[in-house]
Design a protein with these regions (language model features):
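Active-site beta->alpha N-cap acidic-glycine motif
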Residues: 1-81, 92-114
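Catalytic domains of cell-wall/extracellular-matrix polysaccharide-remodeling enzymes
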Residues: 39-40, 64-181, 185-202, 207-208, ...
Length: 225
């Protein structure tokens, strides 16, 4: 199984392109939404939910769970003031999403889940403690971050999907169980088209696709499927 996930937010054009491709190939995905933009286009969020995709939080204002020190190149813990601000942000993000899609169910399955994706994928013990303390059940990063918003061409993004990502001396490749990190932003202009090409290839390789919450239970235990 592969898990297709999309972060942040975007305008009608990139998001509707993604929805078209997912619908065309009968694939469900997980959308980690930055909630502070949703109020400007709530019907677009409902469109995602009503297609049967999972809606989850990517924070309200993209506050990180750890501070990055440019001098050392390392992440450090948040201050007490930052933790309080983060906590309020987390609560607000879920409330905003619930406000617009909390009532949406498709085939008896709620669209809104209690999963969370950390902004910039950075974490700290104190930051994660806030995530779980306010009620989120899982913090989900991903094992294959495409950086699709940096792709300079369709061919480059397809090459990333097919041949992997080089990090240091390692080459990371998509494999069974991969959680693929993509974006629904306007900058990710090749993502939908690349998926239109790659999904049939992955299916031929024997992969299926699923929402993350179909493999993770709401009580924080593995679904075992």
């Amino acid at each position: 199984v592969l898990f297709l996930t999309f972060d942040d937010w975007g305008t009608d054009v990139p998001i509707n392109r993604l929805l078209y491709v997912l619908r065309k190939h009968n694939v469900k995905a997980t959308f980690f939404v930055r909630a502070n933009y949703v109020e400007y286009n709530p019907n677009l969020l409902r469109s995602i939910a009503e297609e049967g995709h999972e809606i989850a939080s990517h924070s309200y204002a993209h506050l990180p769970l750890a501070d990055y020190n440019e001098g050392t190149g390392r992440y450090t813990s948040l201050t007490e003031e930052e933790l309080l601000e983060l906590r309020a942000d987390l609560v607000r993000s879920y409330r905003e999403l619930y406000r617009y899609v909390g009532d949406v169910e498709v085939d008896g399955v709620p669209s809104l889940s209690a999963l969370f994706r950390p902004p910039t994928l950075s974490v700290s013990y104190e930051g994660l403690s806030q995530v779980f303390d306010v009620g989120f059940t899982y913090s989900v990063s991903g094992d294959f971050s495409t950086h699709d918003y940096e792709a300079e061409s369709l061919e480059q993004l397809i090459d990333t999907f097919k041949n992997g990502i080089v990090t240091g001396q390692r080459r990371l490749r998509i494999q069974n169980g991969s959680c693929i990190v993509m974006h629904m932003s306007d900058e990710s202009k090749y993502t939908a088209q690349a998926l239109d090409i790659m999904i049939p290839i992955w299916k031929e390789q024997g992969y299926s696709f699923a929402r993350l919450d179909s493999y993770l239970t709401q009580d924080g235990q593995d679904g075992g499927r």
